[in-house]
């Protein structure tokens, strides 16, 4: 879990208002983490945490791409 927090902090540093209207962050996940996100509820929980940790504005679309079907979430304030 600690390494996951480090990843989110790194993403927070990479996402800045200077990046423009559209920013794409691509992160390679470990196989163990990918296995955990294969469940819909855990994937959506993770996407919601990303919205909160990165302070993404309401209406931001977040997509998790992995071996299975993609998961989508629109951040809400």
Swiss-Prot record:
Expression sites (tissue/organ): Expressed in lung, and specifically in alveolar type II epithelial cells.
**Keyword Secreted, does the record have it?**
yes
Keyword line: Cytoplasmic vesicle, Glycoprotein, Golgi apparatus, Secreted, Signal
Post-translation changes: N-glycosylated.
Q: Which Pfam families does the entry link to?
A: SFTA2
The record's induction entry says:
Down-regulated in response to LPS (lipopolysaccharide) challenge.
Instruction: Report the leader peptide range.
Output: 1-19
InterPro entries, per database record = SFTA2
Q: What is its main location?
A: secreted
- Where does the source fall among the domains of life? Eukaryota
Kindly state one GO CC term assigned in the UniProt record.
Golgi apparatus
Q: Which residues are glycosylated?
A: 61
Q: State the compartments where it is located.
A: Secreted; Cytoplasmic vesicle, Secretory vesicle; Golgi apparatus
Q: What does this protein do?
A: Putative surfactant protein.
Name the UniProt record assigns to this protein: Surfactant-associated protein 2
- Please spell out the taxonomic lineage of the organism that makes this protein: Eukaryota, Metazoa, Chordata, Craniata, Vertebrata
């Amino acid at each position: 879990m600690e390494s996951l927090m480090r990843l989110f902090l790194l993403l927070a540093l990479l996402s800045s208002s200077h990046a423009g209207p559209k920013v794409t962050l691509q992160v390679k996940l470990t196989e163990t983490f990918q296995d955990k996100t294969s469940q819909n509820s855990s994937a959506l929980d993770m996407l919601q945490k990303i919205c909160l940790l990165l302070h993404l504005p309401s209406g931001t679309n977040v997509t998790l791409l992995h071996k299975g079907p993609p998961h989508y979430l629109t951040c809400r304030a």
